[in-house]
Amino acid sequence: MSNPTLTFVTGNANKLREVQQIFSLTPNFPYELTNKDLDLPEIQGTTRDVAQAKCAAAAKALGGACITEDTALGFHALGGLPGPYIKDFMKTIGHDGLNKMLDGFEDRTASAICTFAYCAGPDEQVHLFEGRTEGVIVPPRGPTHFGWDPILEIKGTGLTYAEMDPKQKNTLSHRYKALTLLQDYLVGLSKQN
């Protein structure tokens, strides 16, 4: 008997690869992960609000179980900005601009927040799973192909995400922490069925 399908709704190949790598660490993961890129409206609000609305819309569009993800990078000196709007900030001002936002502030600490959402299907409850990693904003270091990874030095490592090999990143990142909670939920759910 084959495993039920779970669709990860994303158009970001880097996120998809990380999720596949992290899920592969779970022996006998009870779902077959597929991927679909949907054009979904993104509301404005907290990361949790965005993740919940996006997942409900995706489940309705797909007519089945799905997961979505929303990521934020919050600068403590700016009260959590850019937060869930980091993607737009990156497109507009890039790594250097994000660094310049903190010029004049002693506090360069930041929180990376990942919220995964799971929905079993249309009109079903959306479940949220949040992971958080602390760090400090630094001038870009390492490859620049994956969002803001080069500017967040992770607390206690001396490395930015971009400087880490995928195995190291995928055992301590905000995405890993959120996915671990999601995996535990999904494994428990599969045992109930």
From Swiss-Prot:
Its EC number(s): 3.6.1.66
Catalytic reaction list: ITP + H2O = IMP + diphosphate + H(+); dITP + H2O = dIMP + diphosphate + H(+); XTP + H2O = XMP + diphosphate + H(+)
Function: Pyrophosphatase that hydrolyzes non-canonical purine nucleotides such as inosine triphosphate (ITP), deoxyinosine triphosphate (dITP) or xanthosine 5'-triphosphate (XTP) to their respective monophosphate derivatives. The enzyme does not distinguish between the deoxy- and ribose forms. Probably excludes non-canonical purines from RNA and DNA precursor pools, thus preventing their incorporation into RNA and DNA and avoiding chromosomal lesions.
Primary localization class, coarse: cytoplasm
Binding site for ITP: 10-15, 54, 70-71, 87, 146-149, 169, 174-175
Lineage, top ranks: Eukaryota, Fungi, Dikarya, Basidiomycota, Ustilaginomycotina
Coiled coil: none
PANTHER family, sorted: INOSINE TRIPHOSPHATE PYROPHOSPHATASE (PTHR11067:SF9), INOSINE TRIPHOSPHATE PYROPHOSPHATASE/HAM1 PROTEIN (PTHR11067)
Matching SUPFAM superfamilies: ITPase-like
Details of cofactor binding: Binds 1 divalent metal cation per subunit; can use either Mg(2+) or Mn(2+).
GO biological process, one term: deoxyribonucleoside triphosphate catabolic process
GO CC annotation: cytoplasm; nucleus
Enzyme class: hydrolase
Protein name: Inosine triphosphate pyrophosphatase
InterPro entries: ITPase, ITPase-like_fam, RdgB/HAM1
HAMAP family listed in its UniProt record: HAM1_NTPase
Family statement: Belongs to the HAM1 NTPase family.
UniProt binding sites for Mg(2+): E42
Subunit record text: Homodimer.
Subcellular location: Cytoplasm; Nucleus
